[in-house]
């Protein structure tokens, strides 16, 4: 069965997470609050020693757009690659777990990419 274009996210947001218990809620809240609704959020728990992994699971239970990968610590680069392996979006945006973005960030970026027919 082919996935319809309607159900396929336009933007995949990948967030490598490592010991970000103090910051991850603000980050995820900023992603969940995007004006562009056609997104998926991939949280890659890179073997956190704090409560980050549990928080990621809680976010995924609250929102079907959020997917979580748990893995042994291997660094941010490999965590990003693991997120890319499951990303379904036409465009990919990487956000660090201690960052947050404005509500219209994904909408503005994707509008520009579509308008300019950007080929990356």
Language-model-detected regions and their locations in the chain:
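Nucleotide-sugar donor-binding/catalytic module of glycosyltransferases
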Residues: 1-120
């Amino acid at each position: 069965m082919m996935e319809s274009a309607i159900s396929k996210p336009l933007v995949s947001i990948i967030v490598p997470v490592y010991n970000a218990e103090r910051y991850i809620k603000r980050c995820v809240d900023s992603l969940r609050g995007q004006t562009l609704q056609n997104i998926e959020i991939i949280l890659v728990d890179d073997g956190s020693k704090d409560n980050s992994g549990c928080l990621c699971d809680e976010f995924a239970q609250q929102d079907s757009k959020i997917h979580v990968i748990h893995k042994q610590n291997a660094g941010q680069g490999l965590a990003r690659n693991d997120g890319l392996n499951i990303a379904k979006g036409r465009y990919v945006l990487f956000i660090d777990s201690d960052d947050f973005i404005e509500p219209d960030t994904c909408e503005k970026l994707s509008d520009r990419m579509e308008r300019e027919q950007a080929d990356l």
